Amino acid sequence: MIGAMPTKKLILTYVDSLRTDMLQRAVDEGRAPTFAALLDRGVLVPDCVSSFPSVTPVACAEMVCGKGADGHWVSGMNWYHRLERRYVEYGSSMEASRAFGVFRVLYDLVYNMNLAHLNPGVSTLFEQLDVAGLRTACTPFLIYRGRHRHQVSLDGLLRRAVDATRLKFRHHTWGPGELFYGDLYASREVPCKPSSIPGSRDGYSACCAAELVKDDAFDFLLFSLPDNDNYSHRHGPEASVESISKADHCFAKLIEAAGGIDAFLADYALILVADHAQTSVHRGLPLAELLERNWSVLQPSESQPERAQLAVSPTGRAAHVYLLPGEGERADPEAVREALSVIEGVELICRFEDNSGHPVTRSEPGTPPSDATAVIERGPRRLRFRPGDEVGDLRGRRWEIDGDLDAIEATIEDGLLRSETFPDPLARVWLALNCPHGGDFVLSLAEGYEAVDWGGVTHAGGGSHGALHAGDSLGPLLFVGCGPKDASEREQWTLRDVAPAVLEHFGLR
């Protein structure tokens, strides 16, 4: 039931891979006047913690569902589907998409991610607001599941690509009241030209959002600005002032449509957030190739998956490794762990073990046994932990821990575990390992390394993200006209706080 309805509508603006220091640099250089005006009027959390792995599908699901991967079930850019015995690839690169089949990737990315992979037992923001009778809207964004049915409307390059392969994408979907998803879904006619080309999508998103503002067509809008991610991948995060400036220009179109900054803020509250940050990448890590020296690794288009011993899912600067229950000789978990521990570039090895210290593995989707203990290994340093009462974290959760805190560069002060290098480390690793589709091993790579995707691509010479490291994980969270009066109301903010803040604004918490 709706509580006291707010006087302001709310726009949740997401800027992919936005780093707080680069945002501030753009403002200081006069390249982002719109964002500067919003920063002057709002409450900034400079170090909001992303998901782990800190990649867009996982982070966006966390943002919109208010839960970690154990709750929303999306585990990476690439993951192994234990039930279907295949990889799920969301488009790490065009080359990776070709390796798995472009149509298969498109189907998983657009349709299955929302209507099959995302936990059906968890409600998205759109679903909760739709049920409450609020008008919802979304420009192109990975997680859009809502209560309104939308017919597919192929257009432009995507139509020609689908027609050329003679594969028909004719599926309706369920989303917010107003849904724009490039060439695929458009809930109304707008004078906006969609683009399926990475790095050229902000303009279409801003055009659609401005039309919705002009028509007073929503109470809640998720407005996405994804192009900064592509620019940072190609040129490195230190060069992202250019793409931030373009995102600022696109946001200014909404301000203009509303009649200027004062008129805009009189009618709209704003939350601006990054899904993750980026760090510089210098080397690719061919994880599957290295493990193939000792085991049979499942390939993208494997005709006999039952013969494979391992599945390897690169996901930026993180990776999942799965032990497969094939028909042949199974890989020994301890041998796999030892092999991973000597690979240069693997910084953290995260896994579960039982009370006897034996590895816990899963052959089917589902959470591990209730007595499982998480382990983080970093070279010879080893830390075991599970929920308990021994020590707290900055989010208020409590843990039992045993081992070397140097594994995550952590200290305990006044009964609270802190790590500047790996923010919110215990909860993020625990959530990743408890994801039903998570690997038996979840890896976080060392600075400068990125896992080579199944298309043979890395962003060496540019930037990437995915690791547990602070450089990948910390981004801005800005509240204007809603949310806390001061950032210190929480000692540590994460993406899991975004959905509750939206619901609170509409009196639904």
Task: Go through each PLM region and give its residues.
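Extreme N-terminal starter segment of soluble prokaryotic enzymes
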Residues: 6-11
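A structural signal for short, well-ordered beta-strand segments and their strand-loop junctions
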Residues: 14, 47-48, 135-141, 220-224, ...
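Short, structured active-site-proximal loop/turn typified by the sulfatase FGly-forming signature C/S-X-P-X-R
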Residues: 24-78, 137
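Short secondary-structure boundary/capping segments
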Residues: 26-30, 152-157, 236-241, 283-294, ...
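Metal-dependent active-site segment of extracytoplasmic phospho-/sulfohydrolases and closely related
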Residues: 34, 246-289, 442-444, 502
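His/Asp/Glu-rich, glycine-adjacent segments
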Residues: 67-234, 384-419, 438, 452, ...
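Active-site neighborhoods of enzymes that stabilize oxyanions during catalysis
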Residues: 118-122, 306-487, 493-495, 499
